[in-house]
């Protein structure tokens, strides 16, 4: 959209949401500019079905959509900032429900700031070009977009549900590099002084798969609180760090963010 301000999204009291594709690049249709606050998955039809968002479909009488088997409601694949915005609304609602469970409350400005700080940057993906298609009155048009045009124009980055819940719950967040090779991560700091001894790191199968973690051992202590691991996927996951001090086991859940 050439960076044009789109209202009501551009109003200062509104959270303006852009859309990113499954490879963290801008969806070809996304709004962008210094007024965009954050982004969320919006799909990109150029990538095929697997690159879109599985969404609910309402009665065809209002949506103009008819399933081949006669159903009036169901699910289908879509793209759009209309896919990205529900991600943000849902995560925001999830966070408020969790805060209420913990007995916490926020002003509008406080919660807005919390959302904005519960994001991960996609700036490193905003380089090179990508192929795209868009619809016109003349049909489908092939085009190429320069991803660098979107740098610093997609807000704080992509809203991360796990980071939001961690920030609300006071769970430590530790960042690591995702290089595909061994990296050293100071997980011991999550345990204070106890973490300077040998630490054990417990990783669920879900976390291992999500971040592509390998090359670590869950049964041996890592000295000085430094965990060595290989990571192939960016994202975030929950791991548990523990240490045995004087016969007492201390542990702390940590949100591990791979970038």
Where are these regions (language model features)?
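Hydrolase catalytic cores
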Residues: 43-149
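Short glycine- and Lys/Arg-enriched binding-loop motifs that mark or flank ligand-binding interfaces
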Residues: 20, 29, 38, 76, ...
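Residue-level detector of functionally special positions within alpha-helical transmembrane segments
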Residues: 80-82, 155, 160, 193
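Secreted peptidase-domain scaffold signal
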Residues: 150, 158-175
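Extracytoplasmic soluble-region selector
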Residues: 170-259
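Extracytoplasmic/secreted envelope proteins and their assembly/folding machinery
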Residues: 5, 14, 26, 85-92, ...
